[in-house]
Amino acid sequence: MINDILTEDRRLVILRSLMDCNNEANESILQDCLDAYGHNVSRDVVRGQIDWLAEQQLVTVENLRGFYVVTLTSRGQDVAEGRARVAGVKRPRPRA
């Protein structure tokens, strides 16, 4: 149960972090963002979450020589802002 809660929160943090980065960031920046929000996870975990978000069409991924560059989709923005719901992503609280 706690693993599901943490996984859903990581996915939301990635989506919101992309919004804060003009809708695009590399995997290293996203790992730093996760760390800033209390998710000290490996690069493999970050990539796994990015791959899952891409499967849900919430982000697109460009692989540049083995390095991920991630772009938020309009659907991903809707989920990050709470206008749409996707099972597996934490529902956001309104931002102040």
From Swiss-Prot:
Keywords: Host cytoplasm, Late protein. InterPro entries: WH_DNA-bd_sf (IPR036390). Induction: Expressed in the late phase of the viral replicative cycle. Expression of late genes is activated by the viral late transcription activator C. It is found in: Host cytoplasm. SUPFAM superfamilies: Winged helix' DNA-binding domain. One of its GO terms (cellular component) is host cell cytoplasm. This is Uncharacterized protein gp26. It comes from Escherichia phage Mu (Bacteriophage Mu).
